[in-house]
Amino acid sequence: MATAACEPVARPSLTSISSGELRSLWTCDCELALLPLSQLLRLQPGAFQLRGEQLLVPGPGEPAAARGGFNVFGDGLVRLEGQLYRLSSYIKRYVELTNYCDYKDYRETILSKPMVFFINVQTKKDISKERTYAFLVNTRHPKIRRQIEQGMDMVISSVIGESYRLQFDFQEVVKNFFPPGTIVLNGENLSFTYEFKADALFDFFYWFGLSNSTVKVHGKVLNLTSTNPEKKETIKLFLEKMSEPLIRRSSFSDRKFSVTSRGSIDDVFNCNLSPRSSVTEPLLAEFSFPSLLECEETSSQLI
C-alpha cells in the first residue's frame, strides 16, 4: 500500500521504538507499553513464572524482589489461553488506608517499580480468538510519575482532614491504542483505587460521594510485540533495565529523571541492530488488520 494511502488511518498512539533510540536512551525512556503476556513470561522468567495453576510473582520478602521487578495490580486471577491462574503476589486494585503511615507506604510502594496490569482482548471479526496482554506503566518516567504524584497531592490539598477516594484509570489510553473493532474484555483491570478513611466526626463530602476523584493517566504507548529473536533480546534488555532497583543520585546532573535506574543504559543497549530497524511488530498480527499492519510496516521503513 502506498504511503499516502496509509497516512489518513495512521494513529499517533501506534508507536514503535527503533533500536537506535534504545541505544541512545539515558534510562528507560518508555511511558507505557503493551506486549503479550506469553512473551513477557519468556523474556522475564525471573519476574514471572507459570507453575501449576499459579502465576508466580516475587513478593516483597523474596530475594528476587530485592533485585527489582514489577508491581502487579489485580484481583488475584489472570486468564491465559483459556485457563485461569492465581497470582501469587500482587497489589489489590482497591485498598483502604486509615492513617498517614499506611498512605506513605502505599505511595512509595506503587511508585517503586513499573506497574503491570493484565487484560484480555478480542476482535469483533473473530470473538473466538482471545489474547492476554500485559500493560506496563513505567513509574520512573517523569511524565507518568508526575501524573500519579500530582493526582495524589491535589486530592489531599482539596480534602484536608477528610476521607476521600482516588482512582487512577488507564482504560482510555489503552482502548485508543488498539485499532477499531478490538474489544478489551476486562477494561476495569486497567485501573486501581485507594480510599483514605479519616477519623472525622462529620464527613459530609465523603458521605455524599463528593470527595471521589479519578485521574485518567495518559502517555505514549509502545508496542513491544515481536517474533524476531534479535529484537526480542533487545526488548528483554529493555524490560530488565526498566525494572532495575531504584537508587537516588546525589548529583543533580546525574538525576535526569526524578528517580533513575542503576548503571548506564548505554552499556546495556549496545546491540548489533540496525539503527533504522523497528523493535516491534504489529500488536495484533494474528488478528489480521490490513490497514494497521501495512501502515506500521511503512512507518518502520520511514524511521
Swiss-Prot record:
<dbReference type="InterPro" id="IPR043460">
    <property type="entry name" value="MEDAG/TEX26"/>
</dbReference>
<dbReference type="GO" id="GO:0005737">
    <property type="term" value="C:cytoplasm"/>
</dbReference>
<comment type="function">
    <text>Involved in processes that promote adipocyte differentiation, lipid accumulation, and glucose uptake in mature adipocytes.</text>
</comment>
<keyword id="KW-0963">Cytoplasm</keyword>
<protein>
    <recommendedName>
        <fullName>Mesenteric estrogen-dependent adipogenesis protein</fullName>
    </recommendedName>
</protein>
<dbReference type="GO" id="GO:0045600">
    <property type="term" value="P:positive regulation of fat cell differentiation"/>
</dbReference>
